[in-house]
């Protein structure tokens, strides 16, 4: 079921015909999709990374349209304007990582309902790359896929931190701590406190400034550390 949702076209700086839609997944969680439906060559499904939101990909949608493609991006559960699963909306939490597949299925159903141009293609970044890999293994109907820094593993330096993470995650569930913020992570969004000179996200100063401006304009997009 689709219903109108906000899409901040002025902040996205994407194609001018962007529309937002609420979509409810099979498990009842409501997500948001943003659609730019002008390119007739096909539609690119955009799978954002953790902490991201649709409007961050307006520039990508503009470039895709320049090459003849429509696009659709998603706010995953727990981030952007999609349903947050905890009272503290700054904690990025999902019950099971596989639950993101409900969002993928809802996104695909919405694309079909809206009659978006086929074939479908995929661009996936970071955490979106991990979600996309599982979806592809489950035969998601896309013609081709492109991955940007996919989260197919998490680097720990020094490696002993990986052992500590395993131990903490194993103990968190029986002690009812699995929904609390992971140790060492912040309650605030990274780009709101980290200076550009020392940030680990991008070497593109205008992009970093844009991300910061986005969260100042729409604080509800902000997300702190994961559970």
Protein language model regions, located:
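Alpha/beta-hydrolase fold nucleophile elbow
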Residues: 115-126
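Active-site glycine-rich loops that stabilize anionic/oxyanionic intermediates
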Residues: 41, 48-52, 60
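Alpha/beta-hydrolase active-site loop
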Residues: 92-112
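Structural cue for short, hydrophobic secondary-structure segments
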Residues: 46-49, 73
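Conserved alpha/beta-hydrolase
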Residues: 54, 61-87
């Amino acid at each position: 079921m689709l219903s109108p949702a906000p899409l901040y076209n002025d902040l996205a700086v994407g194609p001018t015909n962007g529309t937002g839609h609420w979509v409810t997944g099979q498990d009842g969680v409501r997500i948001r999709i943003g659609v730019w439906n002008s390119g007739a060559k096909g539609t690119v499904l955009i799978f954002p990374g953790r902490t991201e939101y649709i409007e961050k990909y307006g520039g990508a949608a503009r470039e895709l349209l320049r090459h003849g493609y429509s696009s659709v991006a998603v706010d995953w559960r727990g981030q952007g304007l999609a349903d947050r699963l905890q009272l503290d909306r700054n904690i990025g939490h999902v019950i099971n990582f596989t639950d993101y597949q409900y969002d993928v299925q809802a996104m695909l159903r919405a694309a079909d309902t809206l009659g978006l141009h086929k074939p479908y293609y995929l661009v996936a970044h970071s955490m979106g790359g991990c979600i996309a890999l599982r979806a592809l293994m489950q035969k998601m109907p896309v013609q081709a896929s492109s991955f940007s820094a996919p989260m197919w593993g998490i680097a720990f330096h020094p490696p002993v931190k990986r052992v500590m993470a395993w131990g903490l995650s194993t103990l968190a569930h029986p002690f009812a701590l699995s929904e609390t913020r992971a140790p060492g992570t912040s309650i605030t969004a990274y780009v709101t406190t980290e200076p550009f000179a020392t940030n680990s996200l991008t070497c593109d100063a205008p992009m970093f400034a844009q991300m910061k401006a986005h969260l100042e304009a729409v604080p509800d997009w902000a997300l702190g550390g994961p559970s």
